[in-house]
A protein has these predicted regions:
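Small/aliphatic-rich secondary-structure junction motif
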Residues: 2-55
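Structural beta-alpha unit
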Residues: 22, 76-112, 148-152
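General small-molecule cofactor/ligand-binding pocket signal
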Residues: 33-35, 88-92, 142
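Short secondary-structure boundary segments
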Residues: 36, 115-117, 145-146
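Glycine-rich, Arg-bearing micro-motifs that act as flexible, cationic patches
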Residues: 111-132, 150-152
Length: 152
């Protein structure tokens, strides 16, 4: 079974990884893919407000590094509960929901596991990554609701 765990580095994502471990970790054939997606910093080219190109590259590099850190942290959390898990990491650039869905199609995932921030009415109105993944995924999606300490 191929399971994608999407992470943004939040405690909600870590809770999703723990739930994925609990549900799928005992199956020897489970292949976990942890995905973290970062968005490139858009270039503002209007003078006199334009910044040097190096600034945008530095910001994109910082976003990529943070996404890698988030994925590594999630892999560590998954490994603590499922020490024998087969885990791969993908760090992708683009819109998070579409990259997660594209990855699921590309690897033939059977399940995507995402955390939910539970933003209530306004969050639902404005949309969210988990909502978009649920509506566009080619496979089952498990949305893990939790209220970790210190976050609401």
């Amino acid at each position: 079974m191929k399971v994608i765990i999407a992470t943004d580095g939040s405690s909600f994502s870590l809770a999703a990884a723990q739930e994925a471990c609990r549900l799928f970790g005992r199956m020897k054939e489970t292949e976990f893919t942890i995905v973290a997606v970062f968005e490139d910093v858009p270039i503002a080219a209007t003078e006199p407000f334009a910044l040097p190109p190096e600034y945008y590259q530095e910001m994109t590099d910082a976003a990529r590094n943070q996404a890698q850190h988030n994925a590594d942290q999630t892999a560590e959390a998954l490994g603590s509960g499922c020490p024998d898990a087969n885990v791969a990491i993908e760090v992708l650039s683009g819109k998070p929901a579409s990259q997660i869905v594209d990855l699921a199609e590309r690897i033939g995932a059977q399940t995507i596991v995402v955390g939910s921030h539970g933003r209530g009415f306004w969050g639902r109105l404005l949309g969210s990554v988990s909502n978009s993944v649920v509506n566009h995924a080619p496979c089952s999606v498990l949305v893990v609701r939790s209220e970790p300490a210190g976050e609401e």
